[in-house]
Amino acid sequence: MDTRAFKRSLHHSERYNRRGFGRAEEVAGSLEQAYQSELIQSIRENGYELREGRVTIRLAEAFGFCWGVERAVAIAYETRRHYPTERIWITNEIIHNPSVNAHLVEMNVLFIPVEEGVKDFSGVESGDVVILPAFGATVQEMQLLNERGCHIVDTTCPWVSKVWNSVERHKKNSFTSVIHGKVKHEETLATSSFAGTYLVVLDLEEAQLVCDYILGNGNREAFLKRFAGATSPGFDPDRDLSRIGVANQTTMLKSETEDIGRLFERTLLRRYGPTDLNDHFLAFNTICDATQERQDAMFSLVDEPLDLMVVIGGYNSSNTTHLQEIAVSRGIPSVHIDAPERIGPGNAVEHKPLGQDLERLEPFLPEGDLRIGITSGASTPDRVVEGVIDRLLQLAEAGQIAAEIA
């Protein structure tokens, strides 16, 4: 399928919209009430610090809603205003945040049902309005919705679209796209649908396995077994790893994406020599600015003396998980929570350790003075961060009173 030609055709359709409906002022009040926070703004203006009682809160200098997320949510709100009575669907979570998605449900936006990992579009009819989320949608989904006569509202983040352009360029020049991402993540599924031949690698370890194979140090059967489900149909490692272009899921850890790119460049340089390197490797620059800013701010924050790190965001949010990884790598006690309600009752928190299921930690806050670092993923509203801070301060005050009584 010529994905470039399809996109051009779709973008010229009267039933396609990716710029909103000119109703920004109409929805501004609803967005502010639901997602913004005067407390968080005041903390920003106070050097990202709040002191109250025995607690000092230190906010990362970049956190929370990114521009792409703000844009997607605003367009979704505008869509409901523009189509007040029409049936509106969304192909997936608009962003990875439970409170934001709950607000869409309250606005009577329907989510495409998923049965055993497969989306069921059977209920979508001609004339329905369908929102594509910030992560994008696969080209096959877009084609289905277009052929069905739906009104498509595309909130795909422009940074994601930039990655799609990169893998289409790989395809045009007969390069295999090596995508650094999570194979089942919505963004990676969408990106791979625009690629030709592709291979998804999760981390530097998997990238090293691929590079070992390129240099003749691998077993074909073991390779295909390891990457089953992570390649394009008919992928042949003996044929398809001679010309490589690297791309990434925009929310992956910046430093690891860069390491993977350098690893493939060194490997192909070793395999084919400097004269022919450009015929076998394409450089890349698909790291999202917002992801990079939040990770850089997190690295700065964990350089400070902290007693505890609280990372806030959806449990299925890739960029939030990578922020948690940074704290863990520095040995700072840390918790990843998706909502204020995870804190309490009592001196306890329900949180998600890296790579594990939810667990309850009790006691949560230690006695004495505390410096607590806080950050949030790109899909987390300031209002949620405010709720977490309120709970932490209430818990700290209750603990202080209990200690004084004792």
Swiss-Prot record:
<feature type="binding site">
    <location>
        <position position="319"/>
    </location>
    <ligand>
        <name>(2E)-4-hydroxy-3-methylbut-2-enyl diphosphate</name>
    </ligand>
</feature>
<feature type="binding site">
    <location>
        <position position="250"/>
    </location>
    <ligand>
        <name>(2E)-4-hydroxy-3-methylbut-2-enyl diphosphate</name>
    </ligand>
</feature>
<feature type="binding site">
    <location>
        <position position="157"/>
    </location>
    <ligand>
        <name>[4Fe-4S] cluster</name>
    </ligand>
</feature>
<feature type="binding site">
    <location>
        <position position="96"/>
    </location>
    <ligand>
        <name>(2E)-4-hydroxy-3-methylbut-2-enyl diphosphate</name>
    </ligand>
</feature>
<keyword id="KW-0560">Oxidoreductase</keyword>
<comment type="pathway">
    <text>Isoprenoid biosynthesis; dimethylallyl diphosphate biosynthesis; dimethylallyl diphosphate from (2E)-4-hydroxy-3-methylbutenyl diphosphate: step 1/1.</text>
</comment>
<feature type="binding site">
    <location>
        <position position="317"/>
    </location>
    <ligand>
        <name>isopentenyl diphosphate</name>
    </ligand>
</feature>
<keyword id="KW-0414">Isoprene biosynthesis</keyword>
<dbReference type="InterPro" id="IPR003451">
    <property type="entry name" value="LytB/IspH"/>
</dbReference>
<dbReference type="GO" id="GO:0046872">
    <property type="term" value="F:metal ion binding"/>
</dbReference>
<feature type="binding site">
    <location>
        <position position="318"/>
    </location>
    <ligand>
        <name>dimethylallyl diphosphate</name>
    </ligand>
</feature>
<dbReference type="GO" id="GO:0051539">
    <property type="term" value="F:4 iron, 4 sulfur cluster binding"/>
</dbReference>
<feature type="binding site">
    <location>
        <position position="185"/>
    </location>
    <ligand>
        <name>(2E)-4-hydroxy-3-methylbut-2-enyl diphosphate</name>
    </ligand>
</feature>
<feature type="binding site">
    <location>
        <position position="96"/>
    </location>
    <ligand>
        <name>dimethylallyl diphosphate</name>
    </ligand>
</feature>
<feature type="active site" description="Proton donor">
    <location>
        <position position="187"/>
    </location>
</feature>
<feature type="binding site">
    <location>
        <position position="66"/>
    </location>
    <ligand>
        <name>[4Fe-4S] cluster</name>
    </ligand>
</feature>
<feature type="binding site">
    <location>
        <position position="319"/>
    </location>
    <ligand>
        <name>dimethylallyl diphosphate</name>
    </ligand>
</feature>
<dbReference type="GO" id="GO:0019288">
    <property type="term" value="P:isopentenyl diphosphate biosynthetic process, methylerythritol 4-phosphate pathway"/>
</dbReference>
<dbReference type="GO" id="GO:0016114">
    <property type="term" value="P:terpenoid biosynthetic process"/>
</dbReference>
<feature type="binding site">
    <location>
        <position position="185"/>
    </location>
    <ligand>
        <name>dimethylallyl diphosphate</name>
    </ligand>
</feature>
<feature type="binding site">
    <location>
        <position position="318"/>
    </location>
    <ligand>
        <name>isopentenyl diphosphate</name>
    </ligand>
</feature>
<feature type="binding site">
    <location>
        <position position="379"/>
    </location>
    <ligand>
        <name>(2E)-4-hydroxy-3-methylbut-2-enyl diphosphate</name>
    </ligand>
</feature>
<comment type="pathway">
    <text>Isoprenoid biosynthesis; isopentenyl diphosphate biosynthesis via DXP pathway; isopentenyl diphosphate from 1-deoxy-D-xylulose 5-phosphate: step 6/6.</text>
</comment>
<feature type="binding site">
    <location>
        <position position="185"/>
    </location>
    <ligand>
        <name>isopentenyl diphosphate</name>
    </ligand>
</feature>
<keyword id="KW-0411">Iron-sulfur</keyword>
<feature type="binding site">
    <location>
        <position position="96"/>
    </location>
    <ligand>
        <name>isopentenyl diphosphate</name>
    </ligand>
</feature>
<keyword id="KW-0004">4Fe-4S</keyword>
<feature type="binding site">
    <location>
        <position position="379"/>
    </location>
    <ligand>
        <name>dimethylallyl diphosphate</name>
    </ligand>
</feature>
<dbReference type="GO" id="GO:0050992">
    <property type="term" value="P:dimethylallyl diphosphate biosynthetic process"/>
</dbReference>
<feature type="binding site">
    <location>
        <position position="319"/>
    </location>
    <ligand>
        <name>isopentenyl diphosphate</name>
    </ligand>
</feature>
<protein>
    <recommendedName>
        <fullName>4-hydroxy-3-methylbut-2-enyl diphosphate reductase</fullName>
        <ecNumber>1.17.7.4</ecNumber>
    </recommendedName>
</protein>
<comment type="function">
    <text>Catalyzes the conversion of 1-hydroxy-2-methyl-2-(E)-butenyl 4-diphosphate (HMBPP) into a mixture of isopentenyl diphosphate (IPP) and dimethylallyl diphosphate (DMAPP). Acts in the terminal step of the DOXP/MEP pathway for isoprenoid precursor biosynthesis.</text>
</comment>
<feature type="binding site">
    <location>
        <position position="317"/>
    </location>
    <ligand>
        <name>dimethylallyl diphosphate</name>
    </ligand>
</feature>
<comment type="similarity">
    <text>Belongs to the IspH family.</text>
</comment>
<feature type="binding site">
    <location>
        <position position="379"/>
    </location>
    <ligand>
        <name>isopentenyl diphosphate</name>
    </ligand>
</feature>
<dbReference type="GO" id="GO:0051745">
    <property type="term" value="F:4-hydroxy-3-methylbut-2-enyl diphosphate reductase activity"/>
</dbReference>
<feature type="binding site">
    <location>
        <position position="288"/>
    </location>
    <ligand>
        <name>[4Fe-4S] cluster</name>
    </ligand>
</feature>
<dbReference type="Pfam" id="PF02401">
    <property type="entry name" value="LYTB"/>
</dbReference>
<keyword id="KW-0408">Iron</keyword>
<feature type="binding site">
    <location>
        <position position="317"/>
    </location>
    <ligand>
        <name>(2E)-4-hydroxy-3-methylbut-2-enyl diphosphate</name>
    </ligand>
</feature>
<keyword id="KW-0479">Metal-binding</keyword>
<feature type="binding site">
    <location>
        <position position="318"/>
    </location>
    <ligand>
        <name>(2E)-4-hydroxy-3-methylbut-2-enyl diphosphate</name>
    </ligand>
</feature>
